[in-house]
Amino acid sequence: MADGIPLNPVRKNLRKTAYYDASRPARYQIEDESSNLDEMPLMMSEEAFENDESDYQTLPRARVSQRRRGLGWFLCGGWKVLCSSCCECLVHTCRRKKELKARTVWLGHPEKCEEKYPKNAIKNQKYNIVTFVPGVLYQQFKFFLNLYFLVVACSQFVPSLKIGYLYTYWAPLGFVLAVTMVREAVDEVRRCRRDKEMNSQLYSKLTVRGKVQVKSSDIQVGDLIIVEKNQRIPADMIFLRTSEKTGSCFIRTDQLDGETDWKLRIGVACTQRLPALGDLFSISAYVYVQKPQLDIHSFEGNFTREDCDPPIHESLSIENTLWASTVVASGTVIGVVIYTGKEMRSVMNTSQSKNKVGLLDLELNRLTKALFLAQVVLSVVMVALQGFLGPWFRNLFRFVVLFSYIIPISLRVNLDMGKSAYGWMIMKDENIPGTVVRTSTIPEELGRLVYLLTDKTGTLTQNEMVFKRLHLGTVSYGTDTMDEIQSHIIQSYAQVSSAQSNGSSASSTPSRKPQPPAPKVRKSVSSRIHEAVKAIALCHNVTPVYESRVNGANAEPESTEADQDFSDDNRTYQASSPDEVALVRWTESVGLTLVNRDLTSLQLKTPAGQILTYYILQIFPFTSESKRMGIIVREEATGDITFYMKGADVAMASIVQYNDWLEEECGNMAREGLRTLVVAKKSLTEEQYQDFENRYNQAKLSIHDRNLKVAAVVESLEREMELLCLTGVEDQLQADVRPTLELLRNAGIKIWMLTGDKLETATCIAKSSHLVSRNQDIHVFKPVSNRGEAHLELNAFRRKHDCALVISGDSLEVCLRYYEHEFVELACQCPAVVCCRCSPTQKAQIVRLLQQHTANRTCAIGDGGNDVSMIQAADCGIGIEGKEGKQASLAADFSITQFKHIGRLLMVHGRNSYKRSAALGQFVMHRGMIISTMQAVFSSIFYFASVPLYQGFLMVGYATIYTMFPVFSLVLDQDVKPEMALLYPELYKDLTKGRSLSFKTFLIWVLISIYQGGILMYGALVLFDQEFVHVVAISFTALILTELLMVALTIRTWHWLMVVAQLISLACYLASLAFLNEYFDLSFITTRVFLWKVCVITLVSCLPLYIIKYLKRKFSPPSYSKLSS
């Protein structure tokens, strides 16, 4: 009975707790004030944790949504939420998601698959022929304003509600929908072509009868596929064989994870040993693989061959996989397909990023809702003044239709076209070459930023690693003393070579050392340097690649002498970490060169040209959790087995033997801005290694909890290791980082640096880059692990004023768990914040916290795959295409090539985009309000009749050819030159207050519209003769001229295209007068009376506004006008 009692019984009524893990932040926790962190359960099921995390994300919204009820909520989007919820329930009811399971795949026998797997077809299309029109219409009419215009247009089919010609209302709506449909159709055709091109690619499929050609879309689970060099891998596969003698190949993964370095993949040993390809069908073998998952960096599976006695079992890991969307870089590979279609890693990781909506769009939406309310109120007032006579509800709806132009239907089209123009200008700017706009809907966000969250490595720094320091505990070597290390290496290997050439003669060695005491010291230093350099040259995942080998030339790796191929000048090093490449290049510079590497051995070339061979027994790759990597090698000459390991100081401190210098020297190097690695070794006997190998192989064959079991076995070996050295690698700053950060700081942008590096290194880079000024105090947040410590440290931080904050990821996690609001409030008051040891999840969490607790816009910038979540979470994401690949660049809204380009991107293009869109939006709304004011005046004078003032082509032409081009030309306007905007970044600070588009400016434009509309209408009524048609001709012509003059008075910097737009619009109107005899009296509009009446009305409507603008600019000029003058 005792076996059935759980060790940690948990009552069902216990309070909700969160999974506590240093690698991922606990986001939400409900507990009492007196709770103790030590009383929390250490583990929680993955499902429970995900539920707990999602509860945190949805709980605040749930509380808010409870208050969002009623008519206002429904009109502002509640109807859309309700419809979407109903559709989602219907979809889930009709089509349940298939449960993913582990599977057994037989080599070359897809018919043996127990289940039906997805078709291997790439489908990025949103619609098909049947669903295109309904789908696009739904996407448009799910917005309230578009639905409103549709209802207004449909109302014209009702005779009692009809105001004028049908095309008066249907033509603008049709134009907007046509533009949208054409744009969607073009994008859909492009997606269809790309999908068809990818799905039609031919691959060689291995069958019993030989090779056959098969399309990518026809590949099935269990097929044996042959992939040539430089060919894309069509589906997720297990690597079985290769044409390379080494049994391995390189793949390029830049389209999968964004990393440009080649990755080494290893074929299954059992199938690699088969004599010919056809033998794959003569064996009975299968692979058992885990269910499809998102993680592209891990894999668990087993290979089994049954036709042997005993059966052969091999464990499979990430090194045996070939994921789809990667490219074979060397040789020809054969693999068995295990996942296809939507179950492939690349497809599962392709998620739709959130549709980012700019702050300006949200502000315009609020203004249009205010206009809608004003339209309804105005219609009610007109009906009330009419006395609610007759069918007043019908008249109410007719007035709503008459005043529908208050809400401009062309607003969205104009803004979208303007955004496209801004994107084109950004990409054509020669001062920021290589800049790409990937999200064209938010260029105005670049002009409203308050917080900039930046990565360090590769963003502020060049990601160009240079070896700078080697510390042995008692002696340190820098760049100016590397020749001493080189001389020690030459001496050490010269002695070894001399001893080997003289055989077992013992007399030759003392003859070289006539002074016993001194040589003992030199020998001690030389041997320590020798061991350290050898460990650095062996402990890595770097592979030397020669141009001749990549191109297919077969070199003999078994050569034991200095080979011509080994001295090839075209040798390059491939590795997933630039730090490792820097270390290997340094060992080459001091005399110990890595010349060859395959699956089983490493070869080093000594300064004398001798080739030393080391057999690779085991490799333990670097992971973000372990923060270290190791290798076990056997030296060919002596047979000695040595376990080498290197890693971060926090991971290695508890592994190496006791010492009194490691922690201090790590801090010293970090203060110099160096990235540190601790190197250690451990000698193993044959018995020790055999015992370890047996336990390790048994753990690797486990399907369940394999990683935990393997880690436990490896940790049993990581004890009392001998500390060899500490290395320091420098990552130099990007060009013009200091002036760029100074520019951003003067623009009122607060800069937060989020990095995974250690605290000392991050602080040093913050100082050297002038992120933190040298005379500014820095508060280093002490490590905290519980609520009490966090409370005390926050109180200490609260007493500091105007100081930069430096905090680690672990302490940040504790603060956010207990004092989220208080911490964010204090941190936002700091001029700069540095968060070190941050995980990618924490970076994104910090972005979301700033969005939730402040009303300001955030921008995230980075260059690596670990920055993608932060970039996608920010209001504006900027990616740098750098050494770590293109993943951040591809996921970002804007892509740049250097950090310094962000200055011009924000100060010039961001500022101009915001001010231009603000002016464009208000002008389009002004164009609708002025004609609605004229309609209101006209109806009020003629006994509140719901009769249109203008009909037919006049209304259509007014919103299109007569005024569209001059108004849209505002996207070319600029208040100051780009040089002045960069010289005076304080101009950018004014934009964050949103004064260019606010309720104040909106009310000013409303008053202008009422004044001008009243003047135009009353003037035309006062000056007209006996014919009503004269009122229409005078008022409409004056309206067109007023709009053109208002645009001209608003422009601050003229462009030749603006002049052309004005002339074209005026010419179009004058030319159309000959065809408007249905609306105008042609004999009247050619008289002088018509001309002077139009001129007087136009002058009265515009001149007072110009005088007021001139006086305001003279006595209270804006900041930009002071610079432009």
Curated annotation (Swiss-Prot):
The chain crosses the membrane at residues 132-152, 162-182, 370-390, 396-415, 929-949, 952-972, 1002-1022, 1031-1051, 1056-1076, 1089-1109. Its EC number is 7.6.2.1. Signal peptide: none annotated. One of its GO terms (biological process) is retrograde vesicle-mediated transport, Golgi to endoplasmic reticulum. The active site is at D455. Residues 558-567 have a biased composition (Acidic residues). It is found in: Golgi apparatus, trans-Golgi network membrane. It holds the Pfam family Hydrolase. Residues 153-161, 391-395, 950-951, 1023-1030, 1077-1088 are extracellular. It is a multi-pass membrane protein. CDD domains: P-type_ATPase_APLT_Neo1-like. Gene3D superfamilies: Calcium-transporting ATPase, cytoplasmic domain N (3.40.1110.10), Calcium-transporting ATPase, cytoplasmic transduction domain A (2.70.150.10), HAD superfamily/HAD-like (3.40.50.1000). Mg(2+) binds at D455, T457, D863, D867. Belongs to the cation transport ATPase (P-type) (TC 3.A.3) family. Type IV subfamily. This is Probable phospholipid-transporting ATPase IIB. The gene is atp9b.
